Amino acid sequence: MDLPYYHGCLTKRECEALLLKGGVDGNFLIRDSESVPGALCLCVSFKKLVYSYRIFREKHGYYRIETDAHTPRTIFPNLQELVSKYGKPGQGLVVHLSNPIMRNNLCQRGRRMELELNVYENTDEEYVDVLP
């Protein structure tokens, strides 16, 4: 995902530290959900707390966010439009999204997994001739 505020597999704790660091209401980022496989979390800071809203991928690649019960269900063609809508006050979040927290690099989990898989790959230099 090529969004500068998408942090991949950032943990909830790491997310909270990043969002609360500046003490600014409206800091936000998107990360992978730790508890719901395939879901994302839109996390936003407000009054020294972090609020998380789950984002689900619907049919045909659309996105749906879970906000409060009084907000009509809206489906978005992409995450940029979702963020754009919730960047305006009074759209159903505890506070509007005002300050994206940009990632330094994506999560290392995928890279770690790739490295672990590479341990079992052999190169020609690792082969030993076996005599009959």
From Swiss-Prot:
- Keyword Phosphoprotein assigned: yes
Please provide, alphabetically and separated by semicolons, the GO molecular function terms listed in this UniProt record: phosphotyrosine residue binding; signaling adaptor activity
Which residues, renumbered to this chain, carry the PTM Phosphotyrosine?
127
Tissue-wise, where is it found? Expressed in spleen, thymus, lung, kidney, heart, colon and small bowel. Expressed in NK cells (all stages of cell maturation), macrophages and dendritic cells.
Q: Which GO terms describe its biological process?
A: adaptive immune response; leukocyte activation involved in immune response; natural killer cell inhibitory signaling pathway; natural killer cell mediated cytotoxicity; negative regulation of natural killer cell mediated cytotoxicity; negative regulation of type II interferon production; positive regulation of innate immune response; positive regulation of natural killer cell mediated cytotoxicity
Briefly state the modifications made to the protein after translation: Phosphorylated on tyrosine residues; probably at Tyr-120 and/or Tyr-127.
Disulphide bonds annotated for this chain are none
Q: How does it assemble?
A: Binds to the phosphorylated receptors CD84, SLAMF1, LY9 and CD244. Does not bind to non-phosphorylated SLAMF1. Interacts with SLAMF7 (via ITSM phosphorylated on 'Tyr-302'). Interacts with Src kinases HCK, LYN, FYN, FGR and LCK (via kinase domains). Interacts (phosphorylated at Tyr-127) with PLCG2.
Name the PANTHER family on file. Answer: INOSITOL POLYPHOSPHATE-RELATED PHOSPHATASE DOMAIN-CONTAINING PROTEIN, SH2 DOMAIN-CONTAINING PROTEIN
Functional description taken from the UniProt entry:
Cytoplasmic adapter regulating receptors of the signaling lymphocytic activation molecule (SLAM) family such as CD84, SLAMF1, LY9 and CD244. In SLAM signaling seems to cooperate with SH2D1A/SAP. Plays a role in regulation of effector functions of natural killer (NK) cells by controlling signal transduction through CD244/2B4. However, conflicting results are reported which may reflect the use of different strain backgrounds.
The protein, known as? SH2 domain-containing protein 1B
Q: What is the lineage of its organism?
A: Eukaryota, Metazoa, Chordata, Craniata, Vertebrata
